[in-house]
Amino acid sequence: MSDKKYNVDEGEIAKFSRIADKWWDKSGEFKTLHDINPLRLDYIDGHADLCGKRVLDVGCGGGILAESMARRGAAFVKGIDMAEQSLETARLHAALNNVADIEYECIRVEDLAEAEPHSFDVVTCMEMMEHVPDPAAIVRACANLVKPDGMVFFSTINKNPKSYLHLIVAAEYLLKFVPKGTHDWKKFIAPAELARMCRQAGLDVADTKGMTYHVLSQTYALCDSTDVNYMFACRPAF
C-alpha cells in the first residue's frame, strides 16, 4: 500500500461515496448527523469562539459541520475528506447557498499536517475516527495542524456493550436510523484510549462531554455519561 493510501479504508470510502448525494437530506441516511449538528456546533463555538477563526474540519463528508461553522462566523473553513463524491456535494451545496470563505480538498489529514503545520485556530474531527484503521495517526495529525493557542475537537463512539446495542442493534437494525453497516463496533474507541492518544500527540483534554438522544424530540443534549457518543475539547500541551 502506498503512503497516499495509508490510513484510508477503501471500503469506508466506497460506502459513503454510494450515498454522497444524500448528505443534505435531513430525513435520509444522514439524519442523525443533522440532528447532532446543532449540539456539536454550540459545543465547539462555546469553547473556541469560531468568529474570525481559521478552521479545519477533518472528515467533513458533505459539509454539514463545515458549512455551519462558516455560517457561525469563522473567517475561513477548510473541509477535507477522502471521498471525492462527498466533497462535490459539499462544494455544490455551499455554492447554491452562497456560503463564502469555505473550501474543500480531497487530501489525507496526515499529508495536510506536513504541508500546513500549525496553521489553524480550530481543528475538528467529528464522527470520523471510528471509520479509519489508525485513529492515533489522525490525532497526531490534528495536533500538528492546530496553532499553539488553538483547540482541537474530537467526537466518536465508546466501545462497550451499550454502544453496540444502541448504535448497531437499535440504530441500524431495529429503528433503521442509519444504513446497516454504517458502524463497525471493533473500531469504536473508549474515552480512556482516546485520551491516551491525545496525551501521546501532545494534547491536553480540557473537557469531556457525552451526548444523549431524545427520541420524541429527535434532538441531542450534552450529558456527563460517555457510555455511547462523546466529545473531547483539547488544547496543545505546553
Curated annotation (Swiss-Prot):
Function: O-methyltransferase that catalyzes the 2 O-methylation steps in the ubiquinone biosynthetic pathway.
EC number: 2.1.1.222, 2.1.1.64
Keyword Lipid biosynthesis appears in the UniProt entry: no
Name listed for the protein in its UniProt record: Ubiquinone biosynthesis O-methyltransferase
Keyword annotations from UniProtKB, A to Z: Methyltransferase, S-adenosyl-L-methionine, Transferase, Ubiquinone biosynthesis
Keyword Transferase: yes
One GO BP: methylation
Family: Belongs to the methyltransferase superfamily. UbiG/COQ3 family.
Catalytic activity: a 3-demethylubiquinol + S-adenosyl-L-methionine = a ubiquinol + S-adenosyl-L-homocysteine + H(+); a 3-(all-trans-polyprenyl)benzene-1,2-diol + S-adenosyl-L-methionine = a 2-methoxy-6-(all-trans-polyprenyl)phenol + S-adenosyl-L-homocysteine + H(+)
Gene Ontology terms, MF aspect: 2-polyprenyl-6-hydroxyphenol methylase activity; 3-demethylubiquinol 3-O-methyltransferase activity; methyltransferase activity; polyprenyldihydroxybenzoate methyltransferase activity
